[in-house]
Curated annotation (Swiss-Prot):
Entry function: IF-3 binds to the 30S ribosomal subunit and shifts the equilibrium between 70S ribosomes and their 50S and 30S subunits in favor of the free subunits, thus enhancing the availability of 30S subunits on which protein synthesis initiation begins.
Listed InterPro entries: T_IF-3_C_sf (IPR036788), T_IF-3_N_sf (IPR036787), Translation_initiation_fac3_CS (IPR019813), Translation_initiation_fac_3 (IPR001288), Translation_initiation_fac_3_C (IPR019815), Translation_initiation_fac_3_N (IPR019814)
GO biological process: ribosome disassembly
Entry keyword set: Cytoplasm, Initiation factor, Protein biosynthesis
Name of the protein described by the UniProt record: Translation initiation factor IF-3
Superkingdom in the source lineage: Bacteria
Amino acid sequence: MKIIAKKDLFINDEIRVREVRLVGLEGEQLGIKPLSEAQAIADDANVDLVLIQPQATPPVAKIMDYGKFKFEYQKKQKEQRKKQSVVTVKEVRLSPVIDKGDFETKLRNGRKFLEKGNKVKVSIRFKGRMITHKEIGAKVLAEFAEATQDIAIIEQRAKMDGRQMFMQLAPIPDKK
């Protein structure tokens, strides 16, 4: 059953149809009833009559405690939002002529990002005439990928974009 916002559901006196297909508290079919009789049944049970499918012929109405239903629905939505994980892309910038110590520092940062579950975009910016030696940049990226292969997979291979070469790494998904 698709649940919609309050403004889309008609409750009790807001329902403006002659007869409805009535569904009971436990989900049992009570048949097609005139609206006044359905409202009386809901009032006797001290709960609400909610029109859940106005497009059906005849429209479907359910007897339920709307406040409790709304609370449960919001609780479910909140749980689903908690389960969603936000993946961010962190960037590590390198140079084609990077020194070993600097490379190790950048590598350590990249590994830290990957261990936290973030994706890492490794980029190399070519300045001046360095652009003529793209193979040096590709070699640096390959070295970075190889150094992180135990915790990451290459999501996007090295590619040029203007004066920049980049690749994207993603953490290896947990095997469950």
